[in-house]
Amino acid sequence: MTMKRYAMTKPCLAGLLASAIFAASAGPLDDAIEKGTRFLLARQQDEGCWSDRQMPALTALGVWALCQSGLPREQTHDAIARGVRFVLATQREDGGFYVPKPGRGGSGLGNYNTSVCLSALFVSGQAPATALLKAREYIASSQLTGDDTMAGGFGYDKISRRRYADLSNTAYALDAMRRTSSLEELRPGGARVDLDWDKALAFVENLMKQDGPDAGGAAYNARTPQAGRETNATGRVSLRAYGSMTYAAVLSMCHARLDRGDPRVRQALEYCQKYWSLDENPGMGSQGLYYFYDILARALAAAQVAAVGEHDWRRELAAKLCSLQRPDGSWMNDNNRFWESDPVLCTSFALLALELCREPAPGGETPDETRM
């Protein structure tokens, strides 16, 4: 798969026009969020879930998006409460949030579901601490140990037929554990549950390209060629980096307590600048596009980056998402890879990204934010 190259020093004319049009209107971002939120409210099922009942993470993403919508509490409270109750009902004795699936060793994408559910439940403020602490135990016990390239990472399931970890699941796990770390103060007896953050960081670094045109970019995992393979000048074959995984690496490194001045973070952000695009998930085209928008926003917000090169990412991303919203308030990807033909999933991703596009302070830039 070929990757499009983009100019680094100047924003494209389309991006400038979109940002100018977006900035000139008083509330297109808030209007888009309200329309998307009302779509989610209308699509919630009677038992409180969204989409596939076997995948509590899909409901959790809807809850998370509603919690951060900014709409008056009385308009979203009941839907959030019903979603929270549904997710809590999927918690197993081992602390994970998932629906067992015998064909997958019984785990039912336990790591993925539990990480997303833990973050959403914490944001909701409506889940008992005991349930969240059990989920933290589940995630911590799912981190792979050892000394190989998988060590420190997370796969889809705690139990699987083969040893496996990838950057997407790892980023969700690290985000959930860092986001909820304050809960450990509530754990009785002075005990604490946490990850091996050094191992997690090593796992992320191992997936980052050190040289060549993709330097600073990150691959999905050490085995699966999601975006293809490439051979460097020494003849070494490796997996090609792409956009969403590079932002996942940035987010993960921030959670591992690296700041944007760290050379590893800077190199990843330079890759993001080099291949800046909101028309595609760089290196993957339309595959996983709405996941890409969400992880981009979360990573750049966590790194406290106000602009990527000349690109004001908040304004450009908000303008792009507003332009993609469908008349019924939803978003949907025509490419079904990673379940993105589901408008509930894409709408949740889009809302979470838009909610991070709100300016952090008057003037659009806090003292801690910088332009890359």
Label the predicted regions.
Residues 26-35, 49-79, 93-137, 142-319, ...:
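An alpha-helical repeat/solenoid feature that recognizes helix-turn-helix modules
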Residues 370-372:
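Short, solvent-exposed mixed-charge patches
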Residues 11-20:
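Bacterial N-terminal signal peptides
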Residues 1-8:
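N-terminal secretory signal peptides that target proteins for export/translocation
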Residues 84-90:
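Active-site-surrounding "flap" and adjacent substrate/cofactor-binding loops of secreted or lumenal enzymes
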Residues 35-37, 84:
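Secreted/extracellular ectodomain signature
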